[in-house]
Amino acid sequence: MCIRDSINIVVGTHALFQKDVEYYNLGTVIADEEHRFGVRQRVLIKNKGLDVNYLKMSATPIPRTLAISAYGDTDISIIKTMPKNRKAVITKYVDKEHKREVMDHIKKELKNGHQIYVVTPLIEESEVLDTANATKIYENMKQYFAGIATVGLIHGKLKPDEKEKIMQEFLNNEIQILVATSVIEVGVNVVNATTILVLGAERFGVATLHQLRGRVMRSDSVPYCFFITSDNPTENSIERLKMVEKTTDGFALAEYDLKHRGPGEFFGEKQSGSMNFKYASLKDDSDLLEIAN
């Protein structure tokens, strides 16, 4: 399929860089939520034209993207201000023992006419991982909030039309509590949703946690984000959650992710991990690298 010269702007998903798609004269590519694409996918779309200008946008760049941007040949622009009338999000890492307080907060938000996200890392119970799953939490929420709120369930195993129906019902406030996996991480805009509860939060990375938190930063109401872990989280997991709790600066979170996970490969496909420098360290010598760049 050839995109003719009569078409000036094409908006789409991964389909835009499939093998059989050709462009008459591709000049600029804008990749929103760029961290969601793989290394090969980014190369594919850029190779659809000659000397293509490439603008990549992300609330939290993954380690490799940030490293190439900061220490490579990419110019960086940072937008640090929120849209007009947006309130700062209140983020809290909550011990499992204090879960009742979070549930009381949810009841209060429901009483005020607002909606809630509840996110889990798994769809169903796992024999390997002892963490929250959407199916069980959905049943628990239906029972706990019976007569108070309508609870919905959405995850990646549902058919596209089923997911669309559920999201439309949530958008119309026919569903007040939406239990979900990370499928709601991007592309969801429900202004009336003001609280997100992330269960098994230690199973999510920094970028995903920040993106999930962004689901409730859509209106002029005060948004809330709660992280609750499974039993016995590691010290590294707690440190990661407290870092997200402490700041809403996506670039600062990306830098934290870069220093702790490593940048991956500049000329390979690994998007995190050690670069195996012989003498330098991206974590310890970042100031020197900035001067050299």
List the model feature ranges, each with a label:
Residues F17-K19, F37-G38, P63-R64, S126, ...:
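Catalytic P-loop NTPase motifs of RecA-like helicase/translocase cores
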Residues D73-T135:
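Conserved interdomain linker/interface between the two RecA-like ATPase lobes of SF2 helicase motors
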Residues K99-Q115, T135, E139-N293:
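C-terminal helicase module of SF1/SF2 nucleic-acid helicases/translocases
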Residues A15-K56:
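SF2 helicase catalytic motif II
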Residues T28, R42-I45, K56, T65-S69, ...:
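N-terminal cationic and glycine-rich segments that engage phosphates or anionic surfaces
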Residues G12, I30-A31, A180, V198:
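Hydrophobic residues in beta-strands of the RecA-like P-loop NTPase core, especially within AAA+ ATPase
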Residues S6-I9, N25-G27, L50-L55, T65, ...:
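Loop/turn-to-beta-strand initiation segments
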Residues M1-I3:
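Short, small-residue-biased leader/transition segments that mark boundaries at the very start
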